[in-house]
Regions:
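Alpha-helical recognition/docking segments in bacterial nutrient-uptake
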Residues: 1-5, 10-14, 76-183, 255
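N-terminal helix-turn-helix DNA-binding module of bacterial transcription factors
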Residues: 1-72, 363
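Short beta-strand segments enriched in small/hydrophobic residues
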Residues: 32-34, 69-89, 184, 192-199
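Periplasmic-binding protein-like
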Residues: 78-79, 130-137, 194-196, 253-265, ...
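Hinge/beta->alpha junction and helix N-cap segments in small-molecule ligand-binding domains
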Residues: 84-96, 116-122, 170-180, 196-246, ...
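Short acidic capping loops at alpha-helix termini that bridge into adjacent secondary structure
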Residues: 191-192, 223-227, 283-289
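Flexible loop/turn connectors
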Residues: 242, 246-363
Length: 363
């Protein structure tokens, strides 16, 4: 009896630990511990067992302040952002628009979006421990996804692929976009068509190249290697596009330059427009342009830019819903498990930047 009393006294006197301390002891994120303790989706069974055992052993006590849900978000979402930068530090306006809308929609659902940047995997690990779910937006090494998987943090990858089951991929069908763009230009009579993308190691740019070449072959349009412009990371911006296109467009013989160019973003298309204006080419009379993203500015240009609309409201709602499901948002407990890959199908928005080269029918 005396021994039992002594044991009880020892447990009572032992200082309980909080979720942050337990995360540090186990080397996993606070978000993962929270999901494990609440039996939420997205936690490896072995990890869940480790967390529950540690909670019993160390006498875990929830932080009372963290329970005040009226004052704090129900879910913390870390948006890991790795954009391409312009020479002055500017960023693709299409990417910034997505982030702004994500923040607004998530806030309306008691979710907090934190935009995060990291230089190495150690920084990634440190930042990941402070959020419940991650969203990756930009260009990343595959090692980042392995790191997040090892931490047990569920993640959403926009325009990227992953082999890890805890990571959901939201993929715009850029292959379809390139194919549709070529079909439209071919219908207008264009047979000299160029393509401008970023590095082909990135999923969306690879899709653009594949769809572009496939469509050219279907229409028996020659594939001109020098018109397949793959911008390096440092030049994947408006000014880099302008510099890359000037040598292709500065020729006296119009048959030696493309009559139309397809771009993998509106930002790059603005660079093509700038190059054309610098050497005196008219859009669309001398050069037709098609962008991608449908940023607000594209409709205000003269002429307005033909582009692909990514349906941003639907895209933002999709990412928000997935974040809520993966992070265990109270309103998403009964939702079915999401698909591993979800495709977004952009639509071609025809405006004034593409000219028809076919002659008018004779009366």
């Amino acid at each position: 009896m005396k021994k039992a009393q002594q044991t009880a006294t020892t447990n009572k006197d032992q200082s309980p630990i909080g979720i942050t301390q337990m995360a540090e002891m186990l080397g996993i994120s606070t978000g993962t511990i929270s999901r494990a303790l609440n039996n939420r989706y997205g936690v490896n069974p072995k990890t869940r067992a480790r967390v529950l055992e540690a909670a019993r052993h160390y006498g875990y006590v929830p932080n009372g302040a963290a329970r005040q849900l009226k004052d704090r978000p129900a879910l913390l979402v870390g948006l890991f952002f790795a954009p391409y930068y312009g020479p002055g530090g500017e960023i693709n306006p299409g990417a910034l628009g997505i982030i702004d809308q994500l923040r607004a929609v998530m806030q309306s659902q008691r979710m907090e979006l934190r935009v995060l940047h990291y230089e190495n995997n150690e920084e990634l690990k440190a930042q990941a421990k402070d959020v419940h779910v991650g969203v990756f937006f930009g260009h990343f090494e595959d090692s980042s996804f392995a790191t997040i998987h090892e931490l047990g943090l569920p993640a959403i990858l926009y325009s990227k692929r992953s082999s890890y089951t805890s990571q959901i991929c939201v993929l715009p069908d850029t292959r379809h976009c390139a194919n549709t763009g070529v079909q439209y230009l071919a219908a207008l009579g264009h047979e000299r068509i160029a393509l401008v993308t970023g590095p082909l190691v990135e999923t969306p740019f690879q899709g653009y190249r594949e769809g572009f070449e496939q469509a050219l072959r279907e229409f028996h349009i020659p594939i001109v290697e020098r018109w397949l412009v793959e911008l390096p990371e440092s030049d994947c911006n408006k000014d880099g596009t302008c510099s890359a296109l000037l040598p292709l467009l500065q020729t006296a013989d119009e048959t030696e330059r493309p009559s139309a160019i397809l771009f993998s973003s509106d930002w790059l298309a603005l660079g093509g427009r700038k190059a054309a204006r610098e050497i005196g080419l008219r859009v669309p009379e001398d050069l037709s342009l098609i962008g991608y993203d449908n940023v607000p500015l594209s409709a205000e240009l003269d002429p307005p830019l033909t582009t692909f609309d990514i349906h941003m409201p639907d895209l933002v709602q999709t990412i928000t819903r997935l974040a809520a499901q993966l992070g265990g948002h109270p309103k998403s407990k009964s939702a079915p498990a999401p698909q591993r890959e979800m495709f977004i199908l952009p639509d071609l928005i025809k405006r004034g930047s593409c000219a028809c080269l076919r002659p008018l029918p004779s009366n």
